[in-house]
Regions:
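Active-site neighborhoods and metal-handling regions in enzymes and metal-associated proteins
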Residues: 1-275
Length: 275
């Protein structure tokens, strides 16, 4: 049972800006064999019919007293089960995009067990296809190119917000679909946090500007940051930069088939710890 936009898009190809609204839940049931089944609010039915799915069920929504739960319950009860259980997005880095009240109601009334199915989703999604790799490579490439060209667009006196917007516009112009994540923070010699901002703080001589981005193309993200020095960077900043550069190079060399993320982390962390 899938309810989140990311997993529904992965298994069906369906994407919608309407997911920004929390009013309506959307459901996709992936059986052990055969095509997925969509149970969606009426407003999304026509577009779902353009996907590769054959079975699309809908209900008139908003309808707070029954937002698709009756339809979902009957679907779950009628599909063939081998082990008498249905997996759901209950595990790590997963959420259920439906009212918790409705989830409790579903668990109490459906004649099958709802269990954590996140391991199955992880096992499938961790292995990328060639088409997925192409999309990830594309969004990472254009973000990297935009980062590389940003210094020519920045100057002392700009604000954090102005600097971030210049990067965001460039990434979009290069072909990204959206830039949902781009914190920008600055400070003398470095920054104290990397999750908030930007603000209207003015960039001055000696400042370090940190910008991170999670930009997307066709549902796939890049996720990396860059630091920019304004005026003259201190010797301490230059030393830290050199260590991080070396750690990154070692991490790239450690990222080989068969290695784990733990292996890559340890290789990089060893360099940083010895700083």
């Amino acid at each position: 049972l899938l309810t989140t936009p990311q997993n529904i898009r992965y298994f069906t190809g369906y994407d919608s800006q309407f997911w920004e609204s929390p009013t309506r839940p959307w459901f996709v049931v992936v059986p052990l064999s055969g095509k997925p089944i969509a149970i969606v609010p009426e407003i999304g039915e026509s577009e779902f019919q353009k996907t590769w799915l054959d079975e699309i069920k809908s209900w008139t929504s908003p309808r707070p007293e029954d937002e698709g739960i009756t339809l979902l319950k009957s679907t779950l009860e009628n599909i063939k089960k081998t082990f008498g259980q249905i997996g759901a997005e209950f595990g790590k880095e997963m959420t259920i995009r439906m009212p918790v009240r409705d989830l409790f109601k579903l668990k109490e009334t459906v004649n099958t067990n709802l269990v954590d199915g996140s391991d199955a989703i992880w096992d499938i999604r961790m292995i990328k296809t060639e088409e997925e790799i192409k999309r990830i490579k594309f969004i990472c490439s254009i973000a990297s190119d935009a980062y590389n060209s940003l210094p020519s667009k920045l100057s002392i006196g700009d604000t954090e917000r102005e600097a971030v917007n210049k990067l965001k516009i460039d990434i979009l112009n290069r072909g990204a679909d959206s830039v949902p994540f781009m914190p920008g923070i600055s400070g003398v010699g470095g920054v104290s946090q990397i999750v908030c901002g930007p603000t209207n703080r003015t960039l001055n001589d000696g400042d370090i500007l940190f910008i991170d981005t999670g930009s997307t193309f066709d549902g796939y993200f890049c996720d990396f940051d860059r630091n920019f020095a304004f005026g003259k960077a201190s010797s301490e900043v230059e030393k830290v930069y050199e260590v991080l550069w070396q750690a990154t190079e070692i991490g790239i060399n450690a990222a080989i088939p068969g290695a784990t993320t733990f292996d890559v982390f340890n290789a990089m962390n060893k360099v940083i710890s010895e700083m």
